[in-house]
Amino acid sequence: SKGLTAGYLPMSCVMTTDNVYQAFYDDKVEKGFLHSHSFTGNPLACSAALASLELFERDNVLLHNQSLIQVMAHGLQQLADANLPIKFVRQTGMIAVFTLDFSQNLGKAFANLCLDQGVMIRPIGNHVYLIPPYCTTPAEIGHIFGILNHCLQKLCDHIPQIPKGSSQTIDLP
């Protein structure tokens, strides 16, 4: 749904099989699936979604994304091969995730280092999510991964050797 309105407006899309659709399709109200919310059919959200779908078709966005997915996969592989403190590197389409391999929760500190370099990531604990917009270029994705590498190195440089399970906190400059 975020691809339809960039997450700014409530909009979703449901895809199903014809058998499931037919189970709910009827003129009798009691047979219908009457679940919705107060944003149902919002004209602004529908207009934004239709415009997005037109752009997807006109600009062949899904084909373009295939090349971006490959660039992201290459960047993730380089991070994984760089002997940096990350683990559980994974990717599905244009969403990539890796986990910071520290006993302390440093996701927010890492996010702040990246933000200082102009890259916004989404940390959830020590899990770092990369969700670039579809209009990102391959060069920009390469730049993002360069910054991630730099910030991981910087994070390592400022982390004292703290035993696992220690309650000592870490302050980054």
Regions found by a protein language model. Name each.
Residues 1-173:
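Conserved N-terminal phosphate-binding loop of PLP-dependent enzymes in the Aspartate aminotransferase
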